[in-house]
């Protein structure tokens, strides 16, 4: 039998171990994350992520990502600077597999993420 899960109060789950963001273009920018659930085959992960204000690159070559913004504000754009989109609480951001771009975090951000690696296998 396959069980279901409920994760409550995602806005207030405690995230610890903030560390430097490896792809940051802003010195000292830090992030933290917590994976809440992983599929049995390991191809799908759901979790919470937080990041301090600043700018960083992102590469979704191997997996798509779906982001429900819980708090904070950011601008997300393609690697060439085109298709700039503002995101804020309540928004759903879809980054299809193959997307490359940049994020500019304007206000400390928290999001629920779903990473889907199923199409790379």
What are these regions (language model features)?
Residues 59-62, 66-89:
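A short beta-strand-loop-beta hairpin characteristic of the jelly-roll/cupin
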Residues 86-89, 97-120:
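Ligand-binding loop in jelly-roll beta-barrel domains
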Residues 1-43:
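A short, N-terminal "cap"/entry segment at the start of jelly-roll beta-barrel domains
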Residues 52-55, 80-82, 91, 99:
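Short, well-ordered turn and helix-capping elements at secondary-structure junctions
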Residues 47, 59, 70, 77, ...:
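Beta-strand residues in well-ordered beta-sheet regions across diverse protein folds
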């Amino acid at each position: 039998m396959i069980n279901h899960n409920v994760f409550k109060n995602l806005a207030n789950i405690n995230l610890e171990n903030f560390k430097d963001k490896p792809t940051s273009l802003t010195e000292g920018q830090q992030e933290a994350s917590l994976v809440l659930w992983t599929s049995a085959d390991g191809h799908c992960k759901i979790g919470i992520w937080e990041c301090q204000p600043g700018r960083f690159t992102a590469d979704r070559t191997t997996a798509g990502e779906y982001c429900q913004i819980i708090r904070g504000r950011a601008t997300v754009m393609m690697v060439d600077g085109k298709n700039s989109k503002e995101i804020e609480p309540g928004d759903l951001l879809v980054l299809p597999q193959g997307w490359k771009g940049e994020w500019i975090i304007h206000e400390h951000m928290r999001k629920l993420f779903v990473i889907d690696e199923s199409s790379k296998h």
